[in-house]
């Protein structure tokens, strides 16, 4: 085999190893009006929704992402107060004085700021571009019924 070819392949292999896949999987969708929405999944229930320069986080948890390195939040949605959905340190890493937090009453007690407190059936419009309706959700998987009882 040609030594120059081997050298070239070795060189390319060496530098190709330094490339990393994106740290967090993301999908970008285009709405009917042409708006691009990017959904970034971190882990478990933690994700980010970005559109039109706005960033909404759902259940940010520090163990799932480096929130200090991510864009600041316009809105944070906390689904409930379990440790794998509510992490005050993660919220503090992404919040600004203008960040709106929407959560249930129990989760709101963890924050030193006013939150939109929600319960199933309630609707909030924290920003003119966002309307959120709370719905009841249950974990009906065998062995998990005690975590989200109906």
Task: Please name every model-derived segment.
Residues 2-8:
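Sec-dependent signal peptide recognition
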Residues 10-12:
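Short, linear, compositionally biased motifs with a strong N-terminal bias
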Residues 14-16:
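C-terminal motif of bacterial Sec signal peptides marking the signal peptidase cleavage site
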Residues 62-107:
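Active-site metal-binding motif and surrounding structural segment of the metallo-beta-lactamase
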Residues 88-89, 113, 143-146:
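Short, conserved acidic/polar surface loops in the N-terminal third of protein domains
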Residues 102-106, 111, 115-120:
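Glycine/small-residue-rich loop that forms an oxyanion/phosphate-binding "nest" at active or ligand-binding sites
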């Amino acid at each position: 085999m040609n030594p120059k070819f081997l050298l070239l392949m070795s060189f390319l292999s060496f530098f190709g190893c330094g490339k990393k896949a994106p740290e967090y999987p993301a999908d970008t969708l285009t709405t009917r009006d042409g708006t691009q929405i990017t959904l970034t999944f971190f882990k478990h229930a933690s994700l980010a929704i970005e559109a039109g320069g706005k960033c909404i986080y759902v259940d940010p948890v520090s163990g799932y992402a480096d929130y200090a390195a991510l864009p600041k939040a316009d809105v944070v949605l906390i689904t409930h107060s379990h440790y794998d959905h509510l992490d005050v340190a993660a919220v503090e890493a992404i919040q600004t004085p203008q960040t709106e937090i929407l959560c249930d009453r129990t989760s709101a007690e963890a924050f030193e700021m006013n939150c939109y407190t929600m319960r199933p059936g309630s609707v909030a419009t924290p920003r003119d571009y966002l309307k959120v309706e709370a719905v009841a959700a249950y974990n009906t998987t065998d062995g998990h019924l005690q975590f989200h009882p109906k």
